[in-house]
C-alpha cells in the first residue's frame, strides 16, 4: 500500500478569488512551484456584489504531497477567498 502523500492523480479545484489583475498568475505560480501542471482553467463571470470570480482548475497528474503543500499556500493568499472544492480525479 502506498502512503497517501505518494499517490499521483489529477485534481479538480474550484476557487473563489478576488477579481483583481494577477490573481491567476499568483495561483499558477504556486502550483508551478510545486511541479503541478495545469490542464485547464475556466473563470466564471464576476459576482458584482462581492467582486469575486469563480476559477475552476483541472491539473495534470501530480503528487498528493505537492498538492497539499500548494493548497496550504493558496489558503494564505489574500486574493483566494475560498477553496470551494478539492477533488481527486482518477482515470477509469
Regions found by a protein language model. Name each.
Residues 1-92:
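A conserved regulatory-domain signal marking ACT and ACT-like small-molecule sensing domains
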Amino acid at each position: 500500500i502506498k502512503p497517501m502523500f505518494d499517490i499521483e492523480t489529477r485534481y479538480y479545484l474550484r476557487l473563489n478569488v478576488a477579481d483583481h489583475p494577477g490573481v491567476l498568475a499568483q495561483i499558477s505560480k504556486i502550483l508551478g512551484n510545486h511541479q503541478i501542471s495545469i490542464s485547464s482553467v475556466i473563470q466564471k463571470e464576476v459576482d458584482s456584489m462581492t467582486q469575486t470570480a469563480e476559477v475552476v482548475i483541472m491539473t495534470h497528474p501530480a503528487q498528493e504531497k505537492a498538492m497539499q503543500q500548494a493548497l496550504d499556500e493558496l489558503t494564505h493568499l489574500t486574493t483566494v477567498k475560498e477553496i470551494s472544492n478539492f477533488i481527486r480525479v482518477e482515470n477509469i
